[in-house]
Amino acid sequence: MWQLNENQVYLPPPTPVATIVSTDEYVQRTSLYYHAGSARLLTIGHPYFELKKPNGDISVPKVSGHQYRVFRVRLPDPNKFGLSDTSLFNSETQRLVWACVGVEVGRGQPLGVGVSGHPYFNKDEDVENSSAYGTGPGQDSRENVAMDYKQTQLCMLGCTPPIGEYWGKGTPCNASRVTLGDCPVLELKTEVIQDGDMVDTGFGAMDFASLQANKSDVPLDLCTSISKYPDYLGMAAEPYGNSLFFFLRREQMFVRHFFNRAGTTGDSVPTDLYITGTSGRTPIAGSIYYSTPSGSLVTSDSQIFNKPLWIQKAQGHNNGICFGNQLFVTVVDTTRSTNLTLCAATQSPTPTPYNNSNFKEYLRHGEEFDLQFIFQLCVITLNAEVMTYIHAMDPTLLEDWNFKIAPPASASLEDTYRFLTNKAIACQRDAPPKVREDPYKKYKFWDVNLTERFSSQLDQFPLGRKFLMQAGVRAGPRFKSRKRPAPSSSSSSKPVTPKRKKTKR
């Protein structure tokens, strides 16, 4: 009896898979370098939450030292530059791009440790040095608790937005069997890191708003937020290497206190793990243990900012080429997270004796940044192979360079009407061209416009002088000397008269 072979046959892909190559394969670097720097970038707000007006508009934003700062740096189009050397590239077959070869992220303000907390923090017992066995949390055992967070310094650079990961609420296989009080299912999610997102503070990277219903398990600045951690694995595996040229990271944390949570323990301790206690030890105490983090000492010896960073070789295939004339600089610095306490009197003049009710206390947090870059001008020769490769990576790049890929010829029969203004037929006018939207319009970034801040005079800027020094290049003199040249030895001496030759008579 004949039987069908059940082994699957795998066919090759219909078209060959393009090999991802480094940008060094098709980008030629020139000897022209430019400096670009931002103005002093300042932001200030409330460190725990945003303040809103009665109509819902934000009056004071949330500005915390434990937020990501994602700068979207916009660069000028080098193809529209007025270059003195017209033989640098052929505008018919070549295009110019920027390569970032140096960056320095400057941070202002003094070092300091910020404190966060919750006036209704879910703290049941001190399980590190307990004086008595727990007798139960009662109806409401929340307390006013504050702490300092994990210490993080981070700098990431790429030409597309960074990607973060966190644990979120997933979808169960059988939603009909889920009842109230069941443990939520978890799912690892990845999203774009936006400006203002919270970093990992020591309580894990997770969606606290969806996974903690009591809003009391973490401090105020986290209880309704999502804490994201950079997806280093995902960005390192990106084929073209656009999202992460390099990163510089420093993290440290230790545990300060050990507590347990109040509330019914969802996963009871199995009875085979303990022997039932006597009076005073029943019922068993809560076993949801947790710790409060601390970042410990902050010192200038461990700073990664206010230092030049040179890009010799990126970790991915993109070796610092700024496709789309933009850069994304992601910064985290919790070593300058001091919260400013402000006080205002409610009466004038200030009454005496002192009374707490005569003063209002406020919290604010301010941050100061400065971005400096060194860019190198590069040339891309657009032959058929390179154009096909770039089109597969990002088709909008060729559109920005006024190149288009011709669509394949259509084999279907098209309709063509004779009288285009005939009222008996539908309108035959061509649809207006669609305006291309910003692909990152729905994300929130800190825009930094450097289109008019480029300069080829590198020695006029601190980062430019550092670049010239490490490259072994010395700037020439700008002013010609006005001193007269010293006279030569022959001209300074007295003129010598030749002696008369004696002649015989």
From Swiss-Prot:
Low complexity composition-biased segments: 486-496
Q: Which GO terms describe its cellular component?
A: host cell nucleus; T=7 icosahedral viral capsid
Per the record, the GO terms for biological process are: endocytosis involved in viral entry into host cell; virion attachment to host cell
Q: Which Pfam families match?
A: Late_protein_L1
Q: Which SUPFAM superfamilies match?
A: Group I dsDNA viruses
Cite the entry's keywords alphabetically: Capsid protein, Disulfide bond, Host nucleus, Host-virus interaction, Late protein, T=7 icosahedral capsid protein, Viral attachment to host cell, Viral penetration into host cytoplasm, Virion, Virus endocytosis by host, Virus entry into host cell
Q: Which family is annotated? A: Belongs to the papillomaviridae L1 protein family.
What is the purpose of this protein? Forms an icosahedral capsid with a T=7 symmetry and a 50 nm diameter. The capsid is composed of 72 pentamers linked to each other by disulfide bonds and associated with L2 proteins. Binds to heparan sulfate proteoglycans on cell surface of basal layer keratinocytes to provide initial virion attachment. This binding mediates a conformational change in the virus capsid that facilitates efficient infection. The virion enters the host cell via endocytosis. During virus trafficking, L1 protein dissociates from the viral DNA and the genomic DNA is released to the host nucleus.
Give the record's subunit note: Self-assembles into homopentamers. The capsid has an icosahedral symmetry and consists of 72 capsomers, with each capsomer being a pentamer of L1. Interacts with the minor capsid protein L2; this interaction is necessary for viral genome encapsidation. Interacts with protein E2; this interaction enhances E2-dependent replication and transcription activation.
Listed name of the protein: Major capsid protein L1
